[in-house]
Design a protein with these regions (language model features):
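Conserved Rossmann-fold NAD(P)-dependent oxidoreductase catalytic core, especially the SDR/UDP-sugar
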Residues: 101-144, 171
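N-terminal Rossmann NAD(P)H-binding glycine-rich loop of SDR-like oxidoreductase domains
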Residues: 4-24
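NAD(P)-cofactor binding segment of oxidoreductase domains
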Residues: 72, 86-115
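A conserved pocket-lining segment of Rossmann-fold NAD(P)-dependent short-chain dehydrogenase/reductase
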Residues: 84, 137-144, 170-184, 194-218, ...
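Active-site Tyr-X1-5-Lys
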Residues: 142-171, 199-201
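NAD(P)H-binding glycine-rich loop region in Rossmannoid oxidoreductase-like domains
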Residues: 56-95
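Conserved catalytic-site region of short-chain dehydrogenase/reductase
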Residues: 82, 117-131, 146-152, 164, ...
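C-terminal substrate-binding subdomain of Rossmann-fold SDR/epimerase-dehydratase oxidoreductases
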Residues: 200-311
Length: 311
């Protein structure tokens, strides 16, 4: 039985990935810096699942975690808001650099069969449509400078392994803006989670900027599906994971506002960010990847999840 290590197993993507891998009959070792109570549920009591606490900034711990596995899905990351990323970038940069470097090197030394690295849309320069092969011809957006570069370095490390050791046993996935029902609804929440929280609790639904920027969103469940696909198909070229369809921030706000019966207030004193950011999905399409969770359904799932948390 193939043994898969999933880092970030308590996170938004990791939880879906754990469930999918178990459903497919893999042995799953989940690791995260925090334990999620969901793993106390009876369905995780079987012999095919093991959760282990793991701080990936500790290289020795990474070596221990990969010791008996065949495959690694490196999904762990550092969550946070664009504001914090801009004002306190080293809260992200150094921890991400350490955990990506440690886990990739540990996996190489252990001789794992396959390694999937979760990169980000932030590696791309400002453009209306992002194509995978454009990354190394350009620089990340100024709005994603630190997060973009640290994720690029993770990609570069795997390229380094290929050049130095002849290793080509890895996949790189670059998700668009991820959202889902296991998101963080605190101060560091992402766009959709933040809007749902405001819609539920505030008199007005306040939106940063004028709401015109166009973004590409993908549900965490579809990201998990893409990660699993990249491993099972042994995809060795970077692939985008997104919808390929743009949606304005104001359209997302409208879905949330309609659900809660709230008016929308646009705070034009706040920055819009890049005007348009879409994934080119041609390559992913060629491998048969198509997102299954449409945006409106996904947002309603987030709303239902958040409302459940408030009970």
């Amino acid at each position: 039985m193939t043994k898969i290590l999933i880092t970030g197993a308590s996170g938004m993507v990791g939880k879906h990935l754990v469930d999918m891998c178990l459903q497919k009959g893999y042995f799953v070792k989940g690791t995260d810096i925090r334990y999620d109570e969901r793993y106390s549920e009876e369905k995780y009591w079987g012999e095919n699942f093991d959760f282990q606490h793991g701080n990936l900034n500790n290289y020795q711990r990474c070596l221990e975690l990969v010791d008996d596995v065949d495959v690694v899905f490196q999904v762990a990351g550092v969550k946070g808001s664009p504001k914090r990323a801009a004002e306190q970038p080293n809260d992200y940069f150094t921890p991400m650099l350490q955990m990506n470097t440690n886990m990739a090197e540990a996996a190489r030394i252990a001789g794992v069969e396959w390694y999937v690295y979760t990169s980000t849309i932030g590696v791309y320069q400002p453009a209306e449509v992002f194509k995978e092969d454009d990354v190394w011809k350009t620089f990340p957006s100024e709005n994603d400078k630190y997060a973009g570069w640290v994720k690029r370095l993770g990609e570069l490390q795997l390229d380094c392994f290929e050049t130095h050791y002849g290793l080509k046993n890895y996949s790189i996935v670059r998700p668009a803006n991820i959202y889902g029902e296991y998101d963080n609804f605190g101060e560091e929440s992402t766009v959709i989670a933040s809007l749902v929280k405001k819609g539920c609790n505030d008199k007005l639904l306040s939106v940063w900027g004028d709401g015109t920027p166009i973004r590409d969103f993908i549900h965490a469940e579809d990201v998990a599906r893409g990660i699993l696909m990249s491993y099972e198909n042994k995809i060795t070229e970077p692939i985008n994971l997104g919808s390929g369809d743009g949606v304005r921030i104001r359209d997302i706000a409208s879905i949330v506002a309609t659900h809660y019966g709230k008016e929308i207030e646009y705070d034009v004193t706040k920055p819009n960010g890049d005007n348009k950011r879409l994934m080119d999905m041609t390559r992913a399409d060629s491998y048969g990847f198509h997102p299954k969770v449409d945006l409106e359904t996904g947002i309603k799932r987030v709303i239902k999840y958040y409302e459940h948390l408030q009970k």
